[in-house]
From Swiss-Prot:
This is Ancylostoma secreted protein. Belongs to the CRISP family. The keyword Signal applies. SUPFAM superfamilies: PR-1-like. It comes from Ancylostoma caninum (Dog hookworm). It holds the Pfam family CAP. Associated with the transition to parasitism by infective hookworm larvae. Its main location: secreted. Keywords: Secreted, Signal.
């Protein structure tokens, strides 16, 4: 008799249409075969493709279709790391840092002469969370039996490694992912049309498209040319922080950002386009390296504002942390709102459980210097961004309202498509 043990955690914060088999995965681990690898990979990508195309069942109707849903590729190093971790057939998480993990343990008095049957049942069981429990209209992860599903479906994930191990009457099956889907109140994917060309795929640069799934280009070696005297940050992470901040500022400047208190936030007349500043980054790194989740003292960052972020995911990918932190801060506008007056008041600031100061600092129109850090601490991943000149002055408008670029400073240029004025 088979007895499954399913492991799942909630944090506060039938194979079909198989893709063409690869000639060989090139992995050195002898614990599983290329046939196993192909089966794991096909199940995931076929399921993700069904979501992307809007044909996957929910508990009522279909799941929302997905834009920017990426195709997974197999990672031999992740597979080997996982294989090493499950040698004793554990039923608990392996504690591998920087990844999400699904795991299931089976037991049978007759052993497991053909593990493939249970592997398929395991994958189907993980994936069934959405059909059993449903997913909200915004595709957000809110626990409710979606832990394993969230890791399988998270749209930004691009790499997968799976393994299994038979220990007499026990079988452990597990997969790890280079993206984390179980972030509470964050969408597992963005509703939209499945890609038709690479131009439809924007999460990663130089992406392609294959039958509704985006494909990530080859990894590019990390560089530290922008701020070579600062350690712990890379140019790609800097670019992620800066581009996301400017995308959000552009969107609010053009009147496209929903406000929880009604309508959209007003347009901005002289919203500055941010530039990345190495001295500001150095200050953010100094605070981040303390690994204490609290704001730095004002005297330690004179003239600078600050936003902070943390996740319990250890050694969380720094580019993903940069994007997630920026998104969480900015979400305060659509979750809690500011109102049409666009003024930062003590009443807004002091609403219980309704923080707004991260958003207001990001949107403060006279702020234009940005410097950030992502630090791997012992118990969490810590994100810090500092802003110059700082904002968040009580009783002041967050930004001057009006048509985009209608009040840029003399000598400044306007990026018409972005609605942003050039920085001094």
């Amino acid at each position: 008799m088979f007895s499954p043990v399913i492991v799942s955690v909630i944090f506060t914060i039938a194979f079909c249409d198989a893709s063409p088999a690869r000639d060989g995965f090139g992995c050195s681990n002898s614990g599983i075969t290329d046939k196993d690898r192909q089966a794991f990979l096909d199940f995931h990508n076929n399921a993700r493709r069904r979501v992307a195309k809007g044909v996957e069942d929910s508990n009522s109707g279909k799941l929302n279709p997905a834009k920017n849903m990426y195709k997974l590729s197999w990672d031999c190093a992740m597979e080997q790391q996982l294989q090493d971790a499950i040698q004793s057939c554990p039923s608990a998480f392996a504690g591998i840092q920087g990844v999400a993990q699904n795991v299931m343990s089976w037991s049978s008095s007759g052993g497991f002469p053909d593990p493939s049957v249970k592997i398929e049942q395991t994958l189907s069981g993980w994936w069934s969370g959405a059909k059993k429990n449903g997913v909200g209209p915004d595709n957000k992860y809110n626990g409710g039996g979606l832990f394993a599903f969230s890791n399988m479906v998270y749209s930004e994930t691009t790499k997968l490694g799976c393994a299994y191990k038979v220990c007499g009457t026990k079988l452990a099956v597990s997969c790890i992912y280079n993206g984390v889907g179980y972030i509470t109140n964050q969408p597992m994917w963005e509703t939209g049309q499945a890609c038709k060309t690479g131009a439809d795929c924007s999460t990663y640069k130089n992406s392609g498209c294959e039958d509704g799934l985006c494909t990530k280009g080859p990894d590019v070696p990390e560089t530290n040319q922008q701020c070579p005297s600062n350690t712990g940050m890379t140019d790609s992470v800097r670019d992620t922080f800066l581009s996301v901040h400017n995308e959000f500022r552009s969107s609010v400047a053009r009147g496209l950002e929903p406000d929880a208190l009604g309508g959209n936030a007003p347009k901005a007349a002289k919203m500055l386009k941010m530039v990345y500043d190495c001295e500001v980054e150095a200050s953010a790194i100094r605070h981040g390296n303390k690994c204490v989740y609290q704001h730095s003292h004002g005297e330690d960052r004179p003239g600078l504002g600050e936003n902070i972020y943390k996740t319990s995911v250890l050694k969380f990918d720094k580019n993903k942390a940069a994007k997630q932190a920026s998104q969480l801060w900015w979400n305060e506008l659509k979750e809690f709102g500011v109102g049409p007056s666009n003024v930062l008041t003590t009443a807004l600031w002091n609403r219980p459980g309704m923080q707004i100061g991260h958003y207001t600092q990001m949107a403060w129109d006279t702020t234009y210097k940005l410097g950030c850090a992502v630090v791997f601490c012992n118990d969490f991943t810590f994100g810090v961004c500092q802003y110059g000149p700082g904002g968040n002055y009580m009783g002041h408008v967050i930004y001057t309202m009006g048509q985009p670029c209608s009040q840029c400073s003399p000598g400044a240029t306007c990026s018409v498509t972005e609605g942003l004025c050039s920085a001094p």
